[in-house]
Amino acid sequence: MVSSFTSAPRSGFYYFAQGWKLVSQPGIRRFVILPLLVNILLMGGAFWWLFTQLDVWIPTLMSYVPDWLQWLSYLLWPLAVISVLLVFGYFFSTIANWIAAPFNGLLAEQLEARLTGATPPDTGIFGIMKDVPRIMKREWQKFAWYLPRAIVLLILYLIPGIGQTVTPVLWFLFSAWMLAIQYCDYPFDNHKVPFKEMRTALRTRKITNMQFGALTSLFTMIPLLNLFIMPVAVCGATAMWVDCYRDKHAMWR
């Protein structure tokens, strides 16, 4: 089925909603199964453990609040919870994406072919295995870009006042952008677009990508829904690629 998508500007919210629709398309479901299983097993177990630890971690975080901000504790406590969920959710979604990266790339490739009517390269299981080193190198590039920026934000958490007020907002914005990079990269990488060029392309539609990443980040924090977010985000990002970037960057048509 050739997509009826057009190049007309769409919001990131639209593409996130499209991900939920596309993930259940006939012919696509079988490519969803493995990423879905990886996410359910890893994120399900991780968040179950997290919720058993929150009553220890949150008081520890709140102990960094200076005395002059104690009157804001009723506002800072939920910010502390959200901060933990953001950091924890992104950390484990990164691990899940590393494990499922070859299958996410295949899902993006098959969905793109269905949306456009294009013929993808003939890649079976041996093609996927051959591509694993390149895919893992790409995942490492993303992690190397993410890590120093995340460390700076984590250090800011330790600064009294700023760490409990401003940093959670900065972390949410950073997570939104990083998740846009994470999921939009699969269709870009399928066409061998360099990592730096991909980031430059995303910046041309920064608001759209921030909207998409923000919703993905929010759903990553929600129990049960976060179990399904990986394939949904891959599908939504692929729809965005088809609309916004494919004409300029596609290697196969």
Curated annotation (Swiss-Prot):
Q: How does it sit in the membrane?
A: Multi-pass membrane protein
Q: Respond yes or no to whether keyword Transferase is given for this record.
A: no
Organism this protein belongs to: Escherichia coli O8 (strain IAI1)
Concerning InterPro entries, the annotation shows:
CysZ_sulfate_transptr (IPR050480), Sulfate_CysZ (IPR022985)
Q: Which gene encodes it?
A: cysZ
The cross-references to PANTHER family, in alphabetical order and at most eight, read: SULFATE TRANSPORTER CYSZ
Q: Which GO terms describe its molecular function?
A: high-affinity sulfate:proton symporter activity
Where does this protein chiefly localize? membrane
Q: Where is it localised?
A: Cell inner membrane
Q: Which GO terms describe its cellular component?
A: plasma membrane
What UniProt keywords are attached to this protein's entry? Amino-acid biosynthesis, Cell inner membrane, Cell membrane, Cysteine biosynthesis, Membrane, Sulfate transport, Transmembrane, Transmembrane helix, Transport
Kindly list the residue ranges recorded as spanning the membrane: 31-51, 75-95, 151-171, 222-242
What is the purpose of this protein? High affinity, high specificity proton-dependent sulfate transporter, which mediates sulfate uptake. Provides the sulfur source for the cysteine synthesis pathway.
* Family statement: Belongs to the CysZ family.
Q: What is this protein called?
A: Sulfate transporter CysZ
Q: Which GO terms describe its biological process?
A: cysteine biosynthetic process; sulfate assimilation
Keyword presence, Zinc-finger = no
Q: Which domain of life is it from?
A: Bacteria
